[in-house]
């Protein structure tokens, strides 16, 4: 959808685009697989919207009640709002592209979807990276003076870093409009599943694309990986120290540390899979209708939903609020039957 390559700007561009979208020769998926893929994607979108909507509602209620919100809660609000917008956008794009192809193929509509998609994805990547970094600074057990100073100042820095991430993501999304379009020239070939047609990037576009992806995807990816690995190592070292001093009975603190290690490991795996899928999808490495491209879409849709569910499961406040919500939902049918 958002990773297509188009020919240069001409009067026939919209017609050529629709031909490329509708050409059955490029489709590698059967009607059954297409229907199954759409069903899976819609289920992932709805799950992500519900989970992130719950996180947003809980912290918004905390903000209204206490006139303030914790630093981690602020990051979660930014992250969940960006994911709600992203999941809604992707679901809307599937609906429009499936029901009104002529409208979707218009330049203004297509580029609005593309820019919004990249902006929200980059925001999500940055916010998740800052969440990992914040947990690392607050939980990791290091005694370096610079680290201790950072721990003391991190709560005041996070709001500025979040808005800086929004600005960076917006700048990249506006910049991408000139570099994420393929050109049929004779400079740099990109793999296409159709052997009768070759798609090319101009040399300038290739350099710009590499710079663009490095800043938008690789930097938050590296930051997330480093923060998560250092946090896991710190928790592992502390767990081993606690184990050596254990008396034999189960220590709740040790179990909490082990749970934190597992949760951080899951977050790290999900984040890496999502970043790689996004990079492949935006790079046009595969045809838009190929199985690999579809797999990337499924991964990108699954990440916000699965990560948010894990956040609810591993956060005591969110987990308690979710159980209370489930309890109230179970009570409503009983009240109606009385």
Swiss-Prot record:
GO biological process: detection of chemical stimulus involved in sensory perception of bitter taste
TM spans (from-to): 31-51, 75-95, 117-137, 157-177, 206-226, 263-283, 292-312
Residue numbers on the Cytoplasmic membrane side: 52-74, 138-156, 227-262, 313-338
Extracellular topological domain: 1-30, 96-116, 178-205, 284-291
Cellular localization per UniProt: Membrane
Glycosylation sites: 194
Highest taxon, organism lineage: Eukaryota
CC terms in the record's Gene Ontology section: membrane; plasma membrane
Keywords, sorted A to Z: G-protein coupled receptor, Glycoprotein, Membrane, Receptor, Sensory transduction, Taste, Transducer, Transmembrane, Transmembrane helix
Membrane topology summary: Multi-pass membrane protein
GO molecular function: bitter taste receptor activity; G protein-coupled receptor activity
Additional note from the record: Most taste cells may be activated by a limited number of bitter compounds; individual taste cells can discriminate among bitter stimuli.
Family under the similarity heading: Belongs to the G-protein coupled receptor T2R family.
Function: Receptor that may play a role in the perception of bitterness and is gustducin-linked. May play a role in sensing the chemical composition of the gastrointestinal content. The activity of this receptor may stimulate alpha gustducin, mediate PLC-beta-2 activation and lead to the gating of TRPM5.
PANTHER family the UniProt entry points to: TASTE RECEPTOR TYPE 2 (PTHR11394), TASTE RECEPTOR TYPE 2 MEMBER 39 (PTHR11394:SF142)
Protein name per the record: Taste receptor type 2 member 39
Annotated organism of origin: Macaca mulatta
Gene assigned in the entry: TAS2R39
